[in-house]
Design a protein with these regions (language model features):
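Phosphate-/nucleic-acid-contacting segments
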Residues: 174-236
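Cyclic-nucleotide recognition modules
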Residues: 33, 83-147, 151
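Polybasic "coupling" helices that flank or enter modular domains
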Residues: 129-199
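A short beta-strand-loop-beta hairpin characteristic of the jelly-roll/cupin
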Residues: 70-82
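Cyclic nucleotide-binding regulatory module and flanking cytosolic helices
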Residues: 1-48, 97-98
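Glycine- and acidic-residue-biased ligand/ion/polar-headgroup-sensing regions
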Residues: 49, 60-73, 89-90
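Short phosphate-coordinating micro-motif centered on Lys-Gly-acidic
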Residues: 52-58
Length: 236
């Protein structure tokens, strides 16, 4: 994994406004507020997998994934690495860090060939001071992510391995996947078999056996550094 190597890239205001529209928080802002946010945005490209925020750093910013994904990576005292399901394209993350000065307990890792948009927490707090009606919308964003985390914790702790694997696919569909234009009804998640095993906190052999079972059921297709999810199975 590379150290924090990044290159700043330029994105047009029209493109940035499209990204802002992916959050109900910014949809509630007037044009003056949007212009202010546009002035605060920075966008970065990462050629290689890169740690962009270290545990013990203070977060104080929100991020939007334009391309690639963001991973939460935790490391135990004995050096064991555990990854949580990644944040995929067209999704915002990090709202709670704008109002919490505690240091991170994990690393944020950008996958290779990722483009990530960043807005400082000071800008978000300034928006909320001007327009307190934004607080409930931000709380809704935080609550949505918290509920997913609690669901994942429940399945890892209480349910069978097969149920855990199935729940992982549901979570990936919500926070990681992108629709496939050339294959309607399917979603794509760019992820390695090694990382899937890490999400499940299982050996690669055990995780692969579970995923092959889901593939036989028609729920997913396993490819090279990716899985495809059949949306017809998500509501079953």
């Amino acid at each position: 994994m590379s150290p924090n190597r990044q290159s700043q890239i330029k994105v047009t205001d029209d493109q940035l406004k499209i990204f802002l529209n992916c959050s109900e928080v910014f949809n509630a802002c007037d044009s003056e507020d949007i212009d202010f946010i546009l002035s605060q945005i920075k966008t970065y490209h990462y050629d290689n997998e890169t740690v962009i925020a270290h545990r013990e750093d203070v977060g104080d910013q929100i991020r939007f994934v334009i391309k690639g994904s963001l991973n939460i990576v935790a490391t135990s005292l004995d050096g064991k690495e555990v990854r949580f399901p990644p944040i995929g394209p067209n999704r915002w993350v990090g709202w709670i860090s704008c109002f919490d000065i505690q240091a991170l307990s994990h690393d944020w890792v950008a996958t290779s060939n990722s483009d990530i948009l960043v807005i400082p927490g000071t800008a978000i707090r300034k928006l909320c001071t001007k327009n307190p009606d934004l607080y409930p919308k931000i709380m809704a964003e935080i609550n949505r992510q918290f509920k997913l985390l609690m669901s994942w914790t429940e399945f890892v702790s209480l349910h069978s391995l097969s149920a855990r694997a199935c729940m992982l696919i549901h979570i990936l569909a919500q926070i990681s996947a992108t629709p496939m234009d050339n294959k309607p009804g399917w979603l794509q998640v760019d992820v390695t078999q090694e990382h899937l095993a890490s999400f499940l906190n299982l050996s690669r052999q055990t995780a692969n056996k579970l995923l092959v079972g889901l593939e036989k059921d028609g729920f997913i297709n396993i490819g090279y550094r990716k899985i495809l999810i059949n949306t017809a199975y998500l509501n079953r």
